[in-house]
Amino acid sequence: MTQTASNAAYNAAIEETLIAIEDALDNCDVDMDYERADAVLTITLEDNGTQVILSRQSAVQELWVAARSGGFHLSFKNPGWKCSTTGEDLPTLLDRVLSEQQGAAVSLGLQ
């Protein structure tokens, strides 16, 4: 795969992922707000004001998640995003960090 094709596939995967997360947040029972600026998605838990931030890192073709518990770097491994340090897939990681920050179970229902 050429570098341009690889970049296009990476950017498409990021866009699809962020849209899926936004849709899941819209349908979640937990009171959360989100704001997106280009490829940075900031999720704010309304009960306590804490945030989880997802950002595109094009130079290394990763998706980074910043949470209270730390920073996580995810690479796209078909069929989805995998964290290089915990081995978790993105849905599991997001549910975990959101639950930790909320102090109660959060499930976005992502696949």
Please identify what each model-predicted range represents.
Residues 2-53, 57-111:
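N-terminal intrinsically disordered, cationic/polar leader segments
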